[in-house]
């Protein structure tokens, strides 16, 4: 069985506004069904692609403010989100909604960094970096949701016993 654990930070505070934000997710962990020998054999020498998983992050703040989400992992390898020692997770954010309006995403490197990239409906999540929410310019909101898609793959190898591969996604809310 392959198991992906999602660890989520639940509170963030803005020092300037003394406003509290709460982070929730539709799922705290994602399990993949056991990968059968036939599936691994069919993949040959190529990595085994696991079914894409999807979950939603929700942020609720006491007052409207700029919200940025930053992503880390306790299981990182070569600057990527690792899945065990022979796999990786590719994470994409999309379908962002802030206070009942669709918004675009922009990758950001740090909490106070200016926005320099183009906005898009989808954004690839980079380890130890984040996303900001824009509609022309960075928006202020008290309610926010964003869908994360997790596409995982693992190196094909002979497995004789039950093996659990662990991945981890840590999400931090920052209100710059």
Regions found by a protein language model. Give the residues of each.
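Sec-dependent signal peptide recognition
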Residues: 1-8
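N-terminal signal peptide c-region/cleavage motif recognized by signal peptidases
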Residues: 12-16
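Mature extracellular/passenger domains of Gram-negative fimbrial/pilin and adhesin proteins
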Residues: 17-176
């Amino acid at each position: 069985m392959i198991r992906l654990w999602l660890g989520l930070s639940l509170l963030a505070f803005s020092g300037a506004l003394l406003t509290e934000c709460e982070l929730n997710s539709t799922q705290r962990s994602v399990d993949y069904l056991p990968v059968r020998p036939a599936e691994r054999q069919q993949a040959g020498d190529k990595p085994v692609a696991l079914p894409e998983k999807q979950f939603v992050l929700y942020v609720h703040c006491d007052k409207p403010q700029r919200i940025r989400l930053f992503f880390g992992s306790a299981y990182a390898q070569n600057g990527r989100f690792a899945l065990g020692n022979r796999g990786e997770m590719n994470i994409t954010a999309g379908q962002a909604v802030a206070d009942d309006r669709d918004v675009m995403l922009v990758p950001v490197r740090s909490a106070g960094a200016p926005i320099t990239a183009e906005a898009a409906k989808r954004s690839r999540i980079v380890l130890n970096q984040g996303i900001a929410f824009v509609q022309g310019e960075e928006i202020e909101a008290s309610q926010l949701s964003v869908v994360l898609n997790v596409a995982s793959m693992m190196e094909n190898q002979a497995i004789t016993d039950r093996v659990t591969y662990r991945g981890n996604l840590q999400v931090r809310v920052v209100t710059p």
